[in-house]
Amino acid sequence: MFPEIEKISRRDLLNITLNVLKKYGVKPREKLSQNFIIDPEVIKLILDQVPRDSIILEIGTGIGTLTYYLALKAHKVYTVEIDRKLIRVASDVLRDYKNVEIVQGDALKINWPEVDYLVSNLPYHITSPLIIKMIKYGIPNAVITVQLEVGERLLAKAGSESYGRLSIITQCAYIIERLRKVGPESFYPSPEVSSIILKLRCREEKCIEDLELLEKMTNILFRHRNRSIKWVVSKYFGNEFLNYITSKNFNVNARVRDLDLESIVKLINYCIECEVNLQ
């Protein structure tokens, strides 16, 4: 179906994509963030991150382009697609590959298999909940393409404008590596914004085992990212707890946006010590 990745150009891949869509009478659906990859250099970069004979979960099969090349290298590819029309296309495109299992369903709702890698051009509208699910399922490695703005949030450090709940929760579980920026021209149809490819490797030790506590604490804190810790703690946890963390030399005058991951974990541990309920 597809030529060798080293021998194909972006124009070739675009033409193949257009022909497949025309053949099956499929139009990309904007509400499902359907932008099909047509850049062989991007595909090669993704393939280079995944060891041979890996077991892979792909979120968003599309017409099966990336799936096809992953299947040539992987031991097994589970690929999830919500759009029934695209399931029909991908089933035909990938019919000769016995190591590919196509799953029709919502990636947020179905159970995931145990895999070595997750690979996906993550749909913008479900990026955050998908990453949370990755963490909860203990996905050890991932290569994801996300909108540039989301990528900056994932990579952001304390004090920066992009820093927030998603930065903290993801960095608690994963070491995140920036691979490369990807322009709109690498997809069809071209999205309005650039994307970025990131590689995520599970930390040997998570900063905190109870993800729910981290979610609850960051939810409280980042409702008021520009307020002081003193103000937030006093409002939600009371003055007795405020006095306790002050006695521990916790910087209560810092702004929420400046709290690094280590400080947030300390705050959670103080809550546990004092039996403070995180609502």
Regions found by a protein language model. Name each.
Residues 190-193, 200, 210-250:
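Long, well-ordered amphipathic alpha-helical subdomains in the mid-to-C-terminal portions
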Residues 253:
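Interdomain hinge/lid region at the active-site interface
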